[in-house]
Amino acid sequence: MKLSLQTLVAAVAVAAFSTTAFAGADVEGAKALTKANNCMKCHGIDKDKDGPSFKKTAAKYKGKADAESKLVTHLTTGPKVKLEDGSEEEHKMVKTKDMAQIKNLVAYILEQ
């Protein structure tokens, strides 16, 4: 089988970009942000607390094109959320304006 130079270059480019695109979240950065914002008080990684686990949230948004934007909005606008006891409260907004940090946290949640 004979490969052209164009085919070879295209294959290398696809491999390089897909590795970058799917490199995943900076786990330590995301964990630091969850700690600074006390996220784990209400959310567990794989167990529900007052709020859904990160794993449950990831399953809810799996395969949805708007997952990142919906979660970014949720973390930055303080919407009303319903707790297990039926009461409602405002979800705390993440304490950073750095969109890269917020998107990293969302990527971390969606990877669970």
Task: Tell me the role of every PLM-derived stretch.
Residues 50-61, 74-106:
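Axial heme c-ligation environment in periplasmic c-type cytochrome domains
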Residues 64-74:
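Post-signal/leader-peptide non-cytosolic segments of secretory proteins
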Residues 43, 76, 109-110:
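Protein kinase-like catalytic domain
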Residues 19-34, 60-64:
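Electrostatic cytochrome c docking/interface patches
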Residues 37-45, 105:
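The canonical Cys-X-X-Cys-His
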Residues 1-28, 112:
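N-terminal export/targeting leaders of redox proteins
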